[in-house]
């Protein structure tokens, strides 16, 4: 049965009743390209949150990093110089919470002069590439909302001095949004209400955009993925890359030491023997406050969404179905009469995959302080 034939889908059917035949023909084509099996996750949304047995995971801490600095740095720089390292910047969001009706990365964070978030991130990257004497390919994930503005911003600022050939943009894949009964919302009479598929969808979106050929052509073996929010982070950090390579692990996560047991940050640990991230609200009081013999927290390192993944492993898990997180959100839509509704309270579900679930699909992961 086609989605528009389902009597339950009242928003789609109401829009079609208002449309002209040619509008419905185009709408049906779009509807047929959407994977509607995602709606099934509403019925089993609680199962995603069922967790296994957590156990602590030893981190590579600052004293060890300092003691092995030359070893880690050499291994990381060798990988960069050999063209084995790429980076992915997750930048699909708008700066709405920052009072900005533009891509978040275009925020001016300068004090005495203009300095944009995107600019600072590329400066951080160029600190690494200048020292290594080799460029790192940068793939920037945008969204339908901000893609054109993001590309135009980079063009306007001449890619902040970074070679244009080493920068590629791709759009994050979108999934439909629905009400609490699974009835798909419409954004307009001819467009389904769609939302980004979560930060765990970045590699799948790269594949869909045809960038796997570029990755193979460049010979990339490691991908450093990170979020746009943190202007201080070191990108393609040779010490981090080197520590991961030397450890023999197929992934690594940059972590920061928790300031307090109840700090609201997810911690890197193991779950049923595999690397995983326990969110702060999933941790029992006993877990949160447990300490080692030296007094340090047993679960003491929080993740900051800066990961290094083996490209080979990413391809191996690309076809695996990642857990779908059903998230209650406020979803603007048109009602059954075609009037725009902007809810003040959550009125339905969006469907997201999370990068933390990619970590759990790895065989091992090194926490790097």
Regions found by a protein language model. Give the residues of each.
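Active-site-adjacent bridging/hinge elements
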Residues: 88-100, 179, 284-285, 326-333
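N-terminal ligand-binding/catalytic initiation module
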Residues: 2-3, 229
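N-terminal glycine-rich phosphate-binding loop and ensuing alpha1 helix
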Residues: 3-168, 176, 185-204, 212, ...
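Conserved beta-loop-beta/alpha segment of the NTase-like Rossmann-fold superfamily
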Residues: 159-160, 164-263
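Catalytic core of tubulin tyrosine ligase-like
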Residues: 215, 219-224, 232-236, 241-369
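Short secondary-structure boundary micro-motifs
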Residues: 71-73, 80, 91-93, 207-208, ...
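Fold-independent oxyanion-binding glycine-rich loops
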Residues: 92, 143-144, 172-173, 208-209, ...
């Amino acid at each position: 049965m086609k989605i528009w034939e389902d009597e339950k889908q009242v928003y789609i059917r109401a829009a079609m009743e208002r449309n002209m035949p040619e509008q419905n023909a185009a709408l049906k084509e779009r509807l047929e390209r959407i994977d509607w099996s995602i709606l099934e996750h509403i019925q089993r949304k609680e199962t995603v949150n069922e967790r296994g047995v957590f156990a602590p995971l030893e981190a590579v801490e600052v004293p060890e990093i300092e003691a092995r600095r030359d070893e880690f740095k050499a291994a990381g720089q060798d990988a960069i110089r050999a063209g084995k390292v790429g980076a992915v910047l997750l930048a699909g969001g708008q700066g709405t919470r920052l009072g900005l009706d533009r891509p978040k990365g275009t925020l001016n964070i300068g004090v005495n002069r203009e300095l944009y978030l995107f600019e600072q991130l590329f400066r951080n990257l160029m600190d690494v590439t200048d020292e290594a004497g080799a460029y790192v390919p940068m793939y920037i994930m945008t969204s339908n909302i901000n893609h054109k503005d993001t590309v135009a911003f980079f063009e306007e600022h001449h890619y902040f001095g970074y070679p244009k050939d080493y920068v590629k943009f791709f759009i994050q894949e979108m999934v439909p949004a629905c009400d609490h009964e699974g009835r798909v919302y419409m954004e307009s009479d001819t467009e389904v209400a769609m939302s980004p598929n979560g930060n765990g969808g970045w590699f799948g979106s790269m594949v869909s955009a045809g960038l796997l050929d570029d990755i193979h052509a460049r010979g990339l073996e490691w991908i450093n993925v990170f979020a746009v929010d943190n202007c201080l982070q070191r990108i393609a950090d040779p010490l981090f890359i080197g520590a991961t390579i030397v450890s023999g692990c197929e992934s690594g996560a940059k972590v920061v030491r928790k300031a307090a047991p109840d700090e609201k940050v997810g911690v890197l640990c193991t779950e049923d023997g595999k690397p995983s991230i326990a969110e702060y609200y999933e941790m029992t009081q006993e877990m949160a406050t447990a300490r080692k013999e030296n007094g340090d927290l047993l679960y003491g390192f929080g993740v900051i969404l800066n990961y290094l993944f083996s490209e080979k492993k990413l391809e191996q898990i690309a076809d695996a179905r990642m857990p779908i997180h059903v998230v209650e959100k406020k979803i603007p839509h048109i009602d059954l009469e075609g009037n725009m509704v902007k809810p003040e309270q959550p009125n339905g579900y969006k469907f997201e995959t999370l990068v933390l679930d990619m970590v759990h699909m790895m065989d091992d992961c090194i926490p790097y302080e």
